[in-house]
Amino acid sequence: MTDKQRPFGVSMTEREFDECLHADEAAFRSPIPTQMVSNGEYNPLPQTPKQKQVEFLIKEMADKEAKRHNMSRRQFLATSSGMATAFLAMNQVYGKMFEVDEAEAKNLDAAGDRKAKYKGQFIFDDQTHFIRDDFKEEGLLGLTKWAEGAKVNPNIGNIPTTLSRYKMDNYLKEIFMDSDTTVALLSGAPFDDPNWWLLSNDAIQNACRSVNKMAGSVRMLGHSIITPKYPNWMDEVDRAITELKPVSWKSYTIGDPFGPSKYAWRLDDEKLMYPFYEKAIKAGINTICIHKGLMPRDYEKAFAGTWENATVNDVGKAAKDWPQMNFVIYHAALRPWLADKPDMEMAQFEKDGYIQWSTDLARIPEKFGVNNVYAELGSVFASTAVTDPRFCSAFVGQLVNLMGPDRVVWGTDSVWYGSPQWQIEAMRRLEIPDDIMKKQGWKIKLGDGRGTVKNKIFGLNSAKLYKLDAQKIAADVKSFDHDMIAKMKAEYLAMGGERSNAAYGYIAKDGREFEQG
């Protein structure tokens, strides 16, 4: 397989890609993935011994409960009780990291009662994706192997392996039918080759207008992508301000997400970027979302000359010089784990409190005296939660305690990963262990799933960033309960719609059997 034959979205080397399998073909369809899944931007670690234990327990417990409820294992695992079963299994292996009651797993009504507790919670997903209808690059099919119904109607059955899984119908199903997401921010990515753009700036705004018109409420907001150093890039900024009116900007300081780019740049480049900040602030579009972290194992070689642009060494000065500008750092700048043993990362944190690149971000507010830098959790919450929940709690806890609970925002990087519901449930249930709190001298716990801290992370922080009236959120959520998307969801569930539990992307081969049950 040559590099040109590798699927789009894969920045791993040919050898590294050959060490992977498509997740939905080989991975056990658990409500929570039982090994790290990668979207192709970073190397998935092999399934750890603890993850194998979790998988064994989920199967064992699910078989028992499914039989008792006269269901198949797959049917049971698609229920709220099945989700609870997965968290119980994780707690048995990792210690009590997630708040879950055994009654949820055994009693469908008890699981339903817990689900009702979260009805109406405002959840704003700060990072979501789909592709344009005329996208022709079939290489994108390598990013996932999805074979569930792509329409709102769950009876549509299996669909061919085509790009339709990445398009709006499936996006609406995964984001709004199969999860508790209330509002989604639609994003995109620039590429040196314009043929690879997933969505143009016009397509992003057209999609948002279409969905909001159909819903009868504001369910989607959109980015405009900026491309510093491209010829005449500021002309597109002017057009976006005048015609498109996005809620925020999006870009990659590394230039191209999947390889060395001639357009890498820095946030603190005074000549290049400061005129843009001035223009953005004047237009009232004063939030920019920047991809940081999330690099492949061989990033120093694969992104030679540009990888340092994926760190946060350009954030502090820019934020200090432009206090009216908000800088949302995607993936919380976390450098993916490079070792095959994830406990090595936790061991480093236990030793010195440092998490690669993410801690550098968390220290910026105090170091530079700024309050306009935010950490977003897309992809990195998912990968750490399923690989080492204790590390995940430390990672999120450090962001919350060093940056403040007002400066951490929820994002999932869906639809690449399928439905974000398991991520939402993991965040609702996650807590920082007391020994970590004491050793680090932290004061802020994550708290209840509908408590102050998690409500801020899930949606209220983004509501402020994107100029949604926080005081009207409660009333808006009530309207969301009765808009067209809510009606579609009610019909979908009434017809038997359920999560597929399909994990998308890539997993490490590590000798496992192909399995889908």
What are these language model-derived features?
Residues M1-M71:
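N-terminal secretory signal peptides
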Residues P46, Q53, R132-Y166, P260, ...:
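Active-site gating loops and adjacent loop-to-helix segments of metal-dependent hydrolytic enzymes
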Residues D63-A78, A86-A111:
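N-terminal twin-arginine translocation
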Residues M71-L88, A111-D113, E138, V152-E174, ...:
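Mid-to-C-terminal alpha-helical segments outside catalytic/metal-binding sites
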Residues F124-T128, A184-L186, M220-S224, W249-K250, ...:
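Hydrophobic faces of well-ordered beta-strands that scaffold small-molecule active sites
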Residues D126, K145-S164, K173-W196, R219-I225, ...:
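Divalent metal-dependent hydrolysis catalytic cores, especially in the metallo-beta-lactamase
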Residues L140, F258, Y263-W410, G418, ...:
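Catalytic pocket-lining loop regions of alpha/beta-barrel enzymes
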Residues P190-A310:
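Active-site gating/metal-coordination segments in enzymes
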